[in-house]
């Protein structure tokens, strides 16, 4: 169980809202979770589960 994620490491979870971990280890969400995805960010759409939009896009740099 990830201490920052509300799901077991081998279970399913929805990272979009509840997950605060940088690296989700859930089998249903292998992409990293972040809140750094402005609209139109191609890299984030490929490698991030966006929690909320932000102009500070560290995972797209």
From Swiss-Prot:
Any one GO molecular function term: zinc ion binding
Beta: region residues: 1-29
Residues that coordinate or bind a divalent metal cation 6: 37, 41, 44, 60
Binding site for a divalent metal cation 1: 5, 7, 21, 24
Keyword Amino-acid biosynthesis annotated: no
Modified residues (Phosphoserine): 58
GO cellular component terms attached to this protein's record: cytoplasm; cytosol; nucleus
GO biological process per UniProt: cellular response to zinc ion; detoxification of copper ion; intracellular zinc ion homeostasis; negative regulation of growth; nitric oxide mediated signal transduction; response to bacterium
N-acetylmethionine found at: 1
Residues annotated for a divalent metal cation 3 binding in this entry: 15, 19, 24, 29
Residue segments, region Alpha: 30-61
A Pfam family it matches: Metallothio
PROSITE patterns assigned to the protein according to its UniProt record, in alphabetical order: METALLOTHIONEIN_VRT
Residues that bind a divalent metal cation 5: 34, 36-37, 50
UniProt keywords, alphabetically: Acetylation, Metal-binding, Metal-thiolate cluster, Phosphoprotein
UniProt: a divalent metal cation 7 binding residues: 50, 57, 59-60
Residues that hold a divalent metal cation 4 according to the record: 33-34, 44, 48
Residues given in the record as a divalent metal cation 2 binding sites: 7, 13, 15, 26
Domain comment (free text): Class I metallothioneins contain 2 metal-binding domains: four divalent ions are chelated within cluster A of the alpha domain and are coordinated via cysteinyl thiolate bridges to 11 cysteine ligands. Cluster B, the corresponding region within the beta domain, can ligate three divalent ions to 9 cysteines.
Function according to Swiss-Prot or TrEMBL: Metallothioneins have a high content of cysteine residues that bind various heavy metals; these proteins are transcriptionally regulated by both heavy metals and glucocorticoids.
Family affiliation: Belongs to the metallothionein superfamily. Type 1 family.
Record protein name field: Metallothionein-2
Source organism (scientific name): Mus musculus (Mouse)
